[in-house]
C-alpha cells in the first residue's frame, strides 16, 4: 500500500510498516532475538524482525483491526502502474508544483520515492524543478511512459535478484541506476557528470545536459554559502573548477 508493507493475518490485525530511509526487515531463524530489532513476528518456520539504523528513528508501524482502518492509512494517490495515460495526466496537473514534488506526493501518486523519481525524470529527460503547469502534452506523455517503464523494469529486476528468497541488503542506491546516488559520476546517456540538489536528509540527482538544457539547479546546502556566486551552467561550473585547479 504505497510505501507501506502490509501484513494481514487470518482472524487477526493488519500490520502496516513504513521503513522510511533506514528501516529494514530481516528473516531470521525461529525464535531468534536481537537487541537491535524493534519488532519480532514469530512464525513456525522463522522470525520476521524490523530494525532501524541511525538515530532519527522514523520507521513506523501501525497495527489496525479491519480493512476499513487499514484504508484510512492510505494517502489516496493513484497506483502509477495501473493508471492510464489520461488518469496520469489529470493527477499530474491537479496542482502546480515541481515534478519532483508531484511524483513523490503520496496524495497524488502512490509509492514513488526519492530514488525512483530521480530515475523516472532522467528517463523522461525532464528537470526535477520543472512546473507541471508548463508541461505540454508530449512531455506529459513522455513522463507517463518513463514512469511506467522505470517502475516495471525495476520491479522485474528486483524480483529476479531476490529469486524467491527473502531480500536482504536492501538499499536505495542500486547498481544500474542512471543518476540516483551517482553524484559526480558520468551520465550513462551523455557522459556529463551527474549533479545533485541536497536538502534535509535527501538528495535529488539529475543530469544537467539531459534534463535541464545545461542549467545547474542550485544546491541549497552550498548556494546559501556561495549566494550570488553559484554557477548557473555546466560551462560555468567547469570554468570554476579549472580556475581552482590552476
Can you describe what each PLM-predicted range is?
Residues 4-8, 73-76, 143, 161-166:
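Short low-complexity stretches enriched in small and charged residues
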Residues 25, 91-246:
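Basic, nucleic-acid-binding surfaces and adjacent catalytic neighborhoods in DNA/RNA-processing proteins
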Residues 2, 23, 51, 57, ...:
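Glycine-centered flexibility motif
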Residues 15-126, 131-134, 138, 143-144:
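Phosphate/anion-contacting hairpin/loop surfaces
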Residues 1-59, 202-206, 211-246:
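A cross-family signal for N-terminal binding/gating loops and helix N-caps
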